[in-house]
Amino acid sequence: MTILVLGINHKTASVALREKVAFSDEKRLLALKQIKQTQLAECAVILSTCNRTEVYLHNKNVGPQNDEVWLDSCVQWFADIHQVDLEELKSCLYSQQNLQASRHLMRVASGLDSLILGEPQILGQVKQAYQMSEEYYSLHSDIGMMSTELSRLFQKTFATAKRVRTETHIGESAVSVAYAACSLARQIFDSLRNLNILLVGAGETIELVSRHLLRHGVNGLAIANRTLSRAEKLVEKLETTQKIDIFSLDRLSEGLKRADIVITSTGSPHVLISRNLIEQAQQMRHYKPMLIVDIAVPRDVEESAGEIESVYHYTVDDLHNIIQHNINQREQASQQAEHIIQQESADFFEWLKVHQFSNLIRNYRESAEIIRQDLLEKALQALQNGENTEQVLQELSHKLTKKLIHQPTQAMQTMVKAGNTEGLQAFSHAVKS
């Protein structure tokens, strides 16, 4: 084993445990320092989000004979750095090695392992985690960089995630209520940039809607809420330079008269926007098209509002139908994505095997050259001291043969004990040739 991932996510662990094992930026740097100082691994990348914490490690000195011991050491370190109970952690922890580890990372970065299938934010989080490790090892590694193996894995992963986005429709359809509401608005109106949009409420859903709209360059945004202070706090959280009008619900009729789009999500037990209120607004607007998206449960908008001329009225049930359709599309796209990931992870694993054996061959040749030079130097010294030439050459050839076949002989003995018939057959063919 050279590459290992171990972690927990939203499918294996509770929110409480996920919070305990989360890495802040400061703790992440401490972890990388510990991993280097204890020689737990050559290098590591730590991914920590609200839904998962994963550590990707590379150790070139770990093989089949000691991989379980190394895994146990990594799990113990994981528990120790977060000061959590080892058995509690083990019950929620998953681990993958080499080929499966590379496949897991590619699935994560492509959004196939996310709470919301195909969500795009995770790729940016994986890139950020990689960049933090890259910066750390550029300053603190003996070779001034991350290991070739782990770096290659992440670069391959980024290319794979891009391929998944390009060749499938995994991220094209809205699968959250807030995003679906904004997508619906973009479908009905060619551009949102110069429209007046009224958001009613100041909760989490309206916050998500606000962020989606601001990303699409909306200029005329207004928020109406029962308490102005909560609306003001929402605007502060958005951290935008865009001017956002704020007013209380008693001025709702004024806001409706200016609104091209109304998206509402409050906790009110009663209807806030009556058909009559919308009718009055439409008269003032000369019946220009108005989109109303009512995300609230119970409803904020009177059910018959959609009967008014030029009013497009959608409820949360309509959005859920859209979302379910989109989820089905994403699931179909995920099958294509899995095929791409299977190809790319297999390609990486083939490279990894070739790279490992290239290092093995190079190291063996370097070792043989050191042995040759050492024995030659001793033989030349013996000749200079007047020793018998034939005896010196006999001793040189004997020692050279003995030293050169020592490591291969040990390897064969290990293969015999392990019952590795394929390895022995390959070695036998090589010797015969």
Curated annotation (Swiss-Prot):
Annotated positions binding substrate: T49, C50, N51, R52, S114, E119, P120, Q121, Q125
Question: Which positions bind NADP(+)?
Answer: G201, A202, G203, E204, T205, I206
Return the annotated site residues (Important for activity): H104
| GO BP terms in the entry | protoporphyrinogen IX biosynthetic process from glutamate
EC number(s) recorded for this UniProt protein:
1.2.1.70
Q: Name one Pfam family in it.
A: GlutR_N
InterPro entries (UniProt xref): 4pyrrol_synth_GluRdtase, 4pyrrol_synth_GluRdtase_dimer, 4pyrrol_synth_GluRdtase_N, GluRdtase_CS, GluRdtase_dimer_dom_sf, GluRdtase_N_sf, NAD(P)-bd_dom_sf, Shikm_DH/Glu-tRNA_Rdtase
A GO MF annotation of the entry reads:
NADP binding
**Which positions are catalytic residues?**
C50
Q: Which UniProt keywords apply?
A: NADP, Oxidoreductase, Porphyrin biosynthesis
Q: Which Gene3D superfamilies match?
A: Glutamyl-tRNA reductase, N-terminal domain, NAD(P)-binding Rossmann-like Domain
Q: Which reaction is this enzyme known to catalyze?
A: (S)-4-amino-5-oxopentanoate + tRNA(Glu) + NADP(+) = L-glutamyl-tRNA(Glu) + NADPH + H(+)
Which family is annotated? Belongs to the glutamyl-tRNA reductase family.
Additional info? Answer: During catalysis, the active site Cys acts as a nucleophile attacking the alpha-carbonyl group of tRNA-bound glutamate with the formation of a thioester intermediate between enzyme and glutamate, and the concomitant release of tRNA(Glu). The thioester intermediate is finally reduced by direct hydride transfer from NADPH, to form the product GSA.
Q: How does it assemble?
A: Homodimer.
Domain remarks in the Swiss-Prot or TrEMBL record: Possesses an unusual extended V-shaped dimeric structure with each monomer consisting of three distinct domains arranged along a curved 'spinal' alpha-helix. The N-terminal catalytic domain specifically recognizes the glutamate moiety of the substrate. The second domain is the NADPH-binding domain, and the third C-terminal domain is responsible for dimerization.
Q: What is the designated name of this protein?
A: Glutamyl-tRNA reductase
Q: Which organism is it from?
A: Histophilus somni (strain 2336) (Haemophilus somnus)
What gene is this protein translated from? hemA
